């Protein structure tokens, strides 16, 4: 197999000489969840005042809609701290929700009409109004239902000691180039092998029929009352039905280097869309979208993984990358895990540690658009029918195929080696245990999250009943939780500080909204 590497063992040996490397990974989690009411319907209330400003609270914000909460952990180097902080955020949030609960799945609860989905509001400042207008554009382009599918994003970075082990001493410019090159190698391998993530952790094999709202689909759904499902699906969220973007299929953004990526991204932001132009940009004094290009802003680019750098104030994501190179990567392919109150488990985090480290240490040849399309087709197969035993996946574009099971076992042969090294560094066997558990799932699709969830839905009679049962139990667990890493005082201080920050931003505005937008998009001219 050309794609499963030649140099992995040699690189692993280099890194393993400093066991501290494996204790210093940087991790952060962003978890989305819909607020819902007693009857299992989407909440139509505004963002709770007790959570502060969604615009400036660093831990608790909103995504597309007022009802779509997003929790953001600080960067942590310890898995227990990471998940403990996420627990604490859930606890505090639930204390501010009254009778409302947090929906425990990726696919939304019952939504009668799109009119029930209120766009997220962030205040009266120009930057806040721009965030809401961007969402107005998404609503008009793709519909609101697509935007309230929830996910979990996993942010990950290697410590400086990792790069020291592989490359020795370097100048600042050399190190920046080394990191970017390696992270893009990781990204290419993620496209090649990352279908393992929806296979194991996809948890959206079914949806409420209200989600379609009369739209046609070519997927051969089966019905269980008002629940639609695909018997072998893993992640409808990652399918064409979910949050992907067919309008972006014309884009050719490459991942062979940071320069190639930024060039493709810049072109996408400047490419006009005849389809989106029909929507209008400003009609009768009211904005309908930020602009009529294929992407309004960079965030609109759909991707299962993104190269990232923390931006300075006023800096666009691409400008941050151009300035300092890749700092970390954001994994965006995780469905909400419905079997835990916080949407992600320790086993998942350990697998991601292993998989992302393996992807970075493995050989990663350049990838043209043809090869990228072939790998994307593998992803499409896995999300729609990944639990079909013996499903054949393509190996690149040369016609060779291999079963999902055979390919996964080849990857795990190297993941096991890595797990042993990482366990040795930590003085336990937790990575090996996670590896062993998931390797059993390869030959037993019924153990995957999507299979477990579909079984539960069939037992309960519907997705709605299952979501309400789990969500009700998690509400009680969240309320009973005791702070482990944050404190009530810290959470309340952040709420108060967020309100002050929002007010300061609003008072600092010096131009009207039209001028603000013109200045923001001046770089497109």
Swiss-Prot record:
InterPro entries from the UniProt entry: Gln_synth/guanido_kin_cat_dom, Glu_cys_ligase, Glut_cys_ligase
Pathway: Sulfur metabolism; glutathione biosynthesis; glutathione from L-cysteine and L-glutamate: step 1/2
Recorded coiled-coil stretches: none
Disulfide-linked positions: none
GO molecular function, one term: metal ion binding
Keyword entries, A-Z: ATP-binding, Glutathione biosynthesis, Ligase, Nucleotide-binding
Organism superkingdom: Bacteria
Cellular component, GO, one term: cytosol
EC number: 6.3.2.2
GO biological process annotation, one example: glutathione biosynthetic process
One Pfam family matching this protein: Glu_cys_ligase
Catalytic activity: L-cysteine + L-glutamate + ATP = gamma-L-glutamyl-L-cysteine + ADP + phosphate + H(+)
HAMAP family in alphabetical order: Glu_cys_ligase
Family: Belongs to the glutamate--cysteine ligase type 1 family. Type 1 subfamily.
Alphabetical list of NCBIfam families matching this protein: glu_cys_ligase (TIGR01434)
Protein name, per record: Glutamate--cysteine ligase
Taxonomy of the source species: Bacteria, Pseudomonadati, Pseudomonadota, Gammaproteobacteria, Vibrionales
